[in-house]
Amino acid sequence: MRAHLPWAVLIAAAVGTVWASSGDRSPEFENCLKRCGNARCSTAHHVSLSIPLRLTGWTCEDDCKYSCMQDITSRNIKLGDRVHQYYGKWPFWRLLGMQEPASVAFSLLNFWAHVRGLAKVRREIPDAHPMKRYYILWAFTGLNAWIWSAVFHTRDLSITERLDYFSAALTILYALYYTVIRLFHLYPIPQRNRLTLATPEPPLGTSVTHKAWSLLCILVYVTHVSYLTLLPRFDYVYNIVFNMVIGLTHNALWLLYSLPASISVFRRFPSRPKSYRPAFVTSAGIFVLFTTAASALELFDFPPILRVIDAHSLWHLATAPIALIWYNFLVEDARDESWREVRA
C-alpha cells in the first residue's frame, strides 16, 4: 500500500525523513529547548505530564520539543514566515498524546476497510476455492500493517517506526506473492471442491514452482528486515525503493491482467483462451489508476492545514476506499464461472 509512489516522490520522502529538519536545527529552537528543560525537566522543577501523555510514552524532554515547535510555528504563522519541519516532520497539533491524529484516524479507517474486506472474502468465496486462503492471509497482513501505522502516527519512536515499515513491507510483498500465484496459476487444486464439476481426481500437490516462489519471498523478506535491523542507521532510501519496486511490480501485473481482450497478455483462467475477459477485469485497471492518483497526493507536500491535515494523511484517507474496491474485485474474480472448470 505505501509502495505505490512514483520514484521522485519516494526519494524525496526518504530524503525528507532524514535531512529536512531546518526547524530543529535553528538556534531559536535549541535555545528554547534549553530554557524549557531547565524550567520543567530538572529535578528541582520537574513538571508532571498528563495521563494521556504518559500512556503514549511522552517524556518531559519530548514535551519540551513539542511546546517549542508549536510556539515557534505559531509565531512564524503570525508573522507570515514559512512553516519549518522538525526532525523531518511537519508540526501537528497533538490530541490525547497522538502526534498525528488525522493519520491515526485514517489508518484506523483503512483497518476497518480490511475488516470489511476480510468478512467479504470469508462470506462470498467458497471454502474450497484455491485462492481463498491467500486472500485471507493478505487481509490479516493488512490489518497488522494498519494497526502499526496507527501506532506509529500516535508516537514516532524507533520501535514503532520499524514495526510500521516492516509490517507495510510484509503486506506489499505478500500482495505480490499471491498475485504471481493467481496470475501464473500456481495455486494447488484440491481433490474435491464446489468449484469443479469434473469427476474427482487425486489432489494436485504444491508445484515445485510454487514452493520455489514461496521460499524466494520468505528469503527476500527476512533479508530485507535483517539488513535494516543490523545497520547502525536505518536506510530510509533503500526501504522506500524496496517497497516501491515490489508495489510497482504488483500493480504492473494487474494492469497487464486488465488489458483489452485483443491484446491480452495473461490467460486469466487456465480453461479459457486469452481473449476471455469478463467485465469485472476492468476493476483491476481502475485499482491501479486510483492508487497512482492517490499517491500523487504526496507530490503536493505542504504544511498541515490547521496543523492537522497534510498530504500524507490525505493519502491514508484515499487508500481506504481503494482497499474496498480491491476486495470487491478479488471476490468477483474468485466467483467467475471459469473456476468451475479448473481441474487438477
Region roles according to the model:
Residues 1-20:
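Fungal secretory targeting signals
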Residues 19-344:
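Multi-pass alpha-helical transmembrane bundles in non-GPCR membrane proteins
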